[in-house]
Regions:
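Extended, hydrophobic alpha-helical segments in both membrane/secreted and soluble proteins
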Residues: 347, 409-423, 429, 433-450, ...
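C-terminal, helix-dominated tail/subdomain
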Residues: 462-494
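Bacterial Sec-dependent N-terminal signal peptides
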Residues: 1-23
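Aromatic-residue-lined binding/catalytic grooves and analogous aromatic/hydrophobic interfacial grooves
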Residues: 23-405, 417, 422-424, 442-445, ...
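Substrate-recognition/cap regions that form aromatic- and gly/pro-loop-enriched pockets
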Residues: 599-611
Length: 616
């Protein structure tokens, strides 16, 4: 499936890791954004986020809060847009502006705008604070008393906006009963602030003759990530917003920024990557860099792509919140592609492949907590489809209430479980393993213990599997077997470390060893199905039967050279060109095959795709 470019960049974190001195870690443009996906810059604190257009005469900020979902435990629904903020400046639209620059500083989590117009220097700053749970937008002119603006708020679901006491706010209720609210507080230095209506008759705030404007935005719902309270928080969204905004107002913009930068850099600065920073001109726009890259690869730009991926994961996934979805947390539609959901057949897992290796283990926690919180609903749904089994699994499309749709992705929960083990493998926290991860690893292993079928010859196979979005439904699909193998391996290791359930560990070990082994076909390929039907002309984007190469470790060049050779044949036949996320997966495949040149070739192809005019 296709996906948004921000999601694809999240996946590219798997390719590199290193340390260095400070580098050029920013995106740069010399004109305002006009397109949401390809030009606006994202900010986020893991819960709320925005896309900044940075227009000169009119500012447009489209914002989100990642729990605003339709649907419930039965219906999947979709992730929703939250609202839009407009700041219309009182300036002649025909007046030219010069020295325009908009910069997304990845090393600070700070978006900055600067330009000159009518003899004035205009500066803006934007950031999303995790410690204070607000977004902050600051507007300043070099000439005092010259800042005039109209500030308008808009609900993506059409509720009326209220204005009072220097605040704009709206609140509403979705069809599923979810309550939501957003509020903007306007702080004016110098000048005056008044309520009025715009040309459409909507309530707005007018700022006259100000030196500086600071906008504080908070958005919230009454969602809670626990089934025990029926997914509801006891605190009303309006009260949540008021609590955050009142505290933020006490700090002031400079202290808010200092607190934000300290929090953000504590994560971002854990990794630096030095690929010859001297190659980059500090004034060269990102688009110009991408155009230059088409002619000659620029390693420093590759480092920038890597750090942009880390920025996006930090901005869309923080402890205590929901995981990054198909679009991170940025979404401007109430009917987004694929619901902007949690796809269990690679996409949500791929979002988190980088979390541990890119030294962002704190950003892994939303995904781990999500897996845990969905268990009870998934057990109910699983019993309806697979009566009598223990444990649980998932369908392909998933929401934040346990609701799901499309086809069953039967090994999906086992793939989820890999992240539980990886978090232990990187951090060696036995308390976490014992109390959090192990019970989930065991119950998913129990699902497959009950689900697997033993043939007369003793071989064990997974029944009625489907290689994602490709081919027939039948027994012994390679995708199923490789993920089950990975699950059982991780369970066995966890049980051994904790010295728990010795007899059951022996049982699972025997079951793992009896699984149908990977098969090599007539043209030397690794078979996608037990039947040798692979087509050497097939260029399908999913390469699910290579899970055991990456992110699994069932086969490798050193351990299983024949299977590694067959994987190489399969990859060569599938080709290098594909959707962005598929290309990122292929980078990892070729790296595991110890072919760095081929991995690098696909990486350069991907970056050239990013730099194209038609980005999907």
């Amino acid at each position: 499936m296709h996906t948004k470019i921000k999601y694809v960049l999240l996946t590219l974190l798997i390719i590199c890791f290193g340390t260095s001195q400070a580098q050029r870690y920013y995106l740069l443009d010399n004109k305002p954004a006009t397109d949401w996906m390809t030009e606006a810059y994202p900010i986020g604190n893991g819960r709320i986020g925005a896309m900044i257009f940075a227009g000169v005469n009119q500012e447009h900020i489209q914002f989100n809060e990642n729990s605003l979902w339709t649907g419930d435990e039965q219906e999947t629904g979709a992730y929703q847009a939250f609202g839009d903020l407009f700041v219309r400046f009182d300036s002649d639209v025909n007046k030219s502006f010069t020295a325009y620059s908009r910069k997304l500083n990845l090393d600070k989590g700070l978006h900055e705008i600067a330009y000159q117009q009518d003899g004035q220097q205009i500066n803006r700053r934007y950031f999303a604070s995790q410690p204070d749970q607000v977004m902050v937008f600051e507007y300043a002119n070099s000439k005092k008393g010259k800042l005039n603006a109209q500030i308008a708020l808009q609900d993506a679901h059409g509720q009326a906006v209220q204005v009072e006491d220097g605040h704009l706010w709206f609140q509403g209720t979705l069809d599923n009963g979810m309550r939501y609210a957003a509020q903007v507080r306007v702080q004016v230095v110098g000048g005056s602030l008044s309520k009025t209506t715009d040309e459409k008759g909507q309530a707005v705030l007018n700022v006259k003759s100000a030196d500086r404007i600071v906008l504080l935005l908070s958005a919230a719902t009454d969602y809670a990530n626990t089934r025990a309270t029926k997914w509801k928080s006891a605190e009303e969204p309006m009260k949540v917003n008021e609590r955050y905004l009142q505290q933020a107002e006490k700090y002031g913009v400079n202290k808010l920024l200092a607190r934000h930068v300290a929090d953000y850099t504590a994560l971002f600065n854990l990794v630096e990557l030095d690929l010859d920073h001297s190659q980059l001109d500090s004034k060269q726009t990102t688009k110009a860099l991408l155009e230059a890259y088409k002619k000659q690869p620029i390693p420093a730009l590759e480092a920038l792509v890597y750090q942009y991926g880390r920025y996006l994961l930090i901005s869309s996934s923080r402890k205590g919140g929901l995981p990054a979805n198909l679009q991170g947390l940025w979404n401007n539609s109430n009917n987004p592609p694929w619901r902007s959901d949690y796809h269990s057949n690679i996409n949500v897992q791929m979002n988190y492949w980088p979390a541990e290796v890119a030294n962002l283990r704190e950003s892994a926690w939303p995904y781990l907590d999500y897996i845990n919180s969905m268990r009870e609903v998934k057990k109910i749904n699983t019993q309806k489809e697979f009566p009598g089994v223990r444990g649980w699994t998932v369908k392909t499309e998933n929401n934040i209430f346990g609701g799901e749709s499309f086809l069953w992705n039967t090994p999906g929960s086992a793939w989820y479980a890999q992240a539980l083990w990886e978090h232990y493998a990187f951090n060696r926290d036995e308390k976490y393993l014992r109390e959090f991860a192990y019970p989930i690893l065991k119950e998913i292993s129990e699902f497959w213990d009950d689900r697997l079928v033993r043939r007369p010859d003793g071989t064990v196979v997974a029944p009625k599997g489907w290689s994602p979005e490709h081919g027939p439904t039948e027994d012994a699909v390679s995708y199923d077997h490789q993920i089950i193998y990975d699950l059982f391996n991780n369970y066995i290791q966890a049980s051994t470390i904790l010295k728990l359930d010795d007899d059951y560990r022996k049982h699972i070990t025997a079951l793992r060893d009896a699984l149908l082994k990977p098969k090599i076909g007539t043209w030397g390929q690794l078979q996608e199905w037990e039947t040798d039907r692979d087509d050497p002309q097939d260029k399908h984007r999913h390469v699910s039967h290579l899970f055991g190469l990456y992110p699994g470790n069932q086969f490798s060049v050193l351990k299983t050279p024949e299977l590694a050779k067959a994987a190489r044949v399969t990859l060569t036949a599938r080709g290098d060109e594909s959707t962005g996320w598929s290309m990122a997966w292929k980078v990892a495949f070729w790296a595991r095959l110890q072919d760095g040149n081929h991995a690098y070739k696909i990486l350069t192809n991907f970056i050239n795709l990013v730099g194209g005019d038609d980005i999907d």
